[in-house]
Amino acid sequence: MAIKLEDKKAIVAEVNEAAKAGLSAVVADARGVTVGAMTGLRKEAREAGVYVRVVRNTLLKRAVADTEFSVLNDVFTGPTLIAFSNEHPGAAARLFKEFAKGQDKFEIKAAAFEGKFLAANQIDVLASLPTRNEAISQLMSVIQGATSKLARTLAAVRDQKEAAAA
C-alpha cells in the first residue's frame, strides 16, 4: 500500500519529534510476533513513557538524520520497530528485553544512547540503568550510611575522652 507524500512527511515529523525528545532508542525486528502481543507491548510502552512505532526504513533514516540516533542507520533493514525512551534512558531497553523473553521471534537489533551505538549484546548495560527513584534511593542510602558512620565515630571519640578523663 502506497503512502501519500503528505502522510510520509507527517510520519517523519512525528518520529523526528519523538527522537529529539528521546533519551535513548532501541531498534528491533518484530517479524512473527502476534498482533495481540504487539498490542500488549504498546500498552506497556505507553505506561513506561516509551514511544514505540513501526516505520519504513527510508522514512526512519530521514527522521533521525539530524539527531543523536543517526548512528542506528545501518540497522534499519527489514521491518523495523523503534522505541524512544522519554522519561528514563533504560526504559525502552528494559521493555524490549522483557518482551523478548516471552517472544522467540522478537529480535533486538541495536540501541543508541547519548550518540553512541550499542550492539544487541550490549543492551543489558542500558536496561540495567537504575530508574530515577532507584538512583535517588541508592544515593540516600550511601549518604545515610556515611552520616551514621560519622556519628558512631564521634560517639567513640567522646567515649574515649570520657574514659581517659575518668
UniProtKB/Swiss-Prot annotation:
MF annotations from Gene Ontology: large ribosomal subunit rRNA binding; structural constituent of ribosome
GO biological process entries: translation
Keyword field contains Ligase: no
PROSITE patterns, per database record: RIBOSOMAL_L10
Keywords from the named record: Ribonucleoprotein, Ribosomal protein, RNA-binding, rRNA-binding
InterPro entries: Ribosomal_uL10, Ribosomal_uL10-like_sf, Ribosomal_uL10_bac, Ribosomal_uL10_bac_type, Ribosomal_uL10_CS_bac
Residue runs in coiled coils: none
Annotated Gene Ontology cellular component terms: large ribosomal subunit
Pfam families (alphabetical): Ribosomal_L10 (PF00466)
Family, per entry: Belongs to the universal ribosomal protein uL10 family.
Job of this protein: Forms part of the ribosomal stalk, playing a central role in the interaction of the ribosome with GTP-bound translation factors.
Record's subunit section: Part of the ribosomal stalk of the 50S ribosomal subunit. The N-terminus interacts with L11 and the large rRNA to form the base of the stalk. The C-terminus forms an elongated spine to which L12 dimers bind in a sequential fashion forming a multimeric L10(L12)X complex.
Protein name as catalogued: Large ribosomal subunit protein uL10
Organism encoding this protein: Pseudomonas savastanoi pv. phaseolicola (strain 1448A / Race 6) (Pseudomonas syringae pv. phaseolicola (strain 1448A / Race 6))
Gene from which the chain derives: rplJ
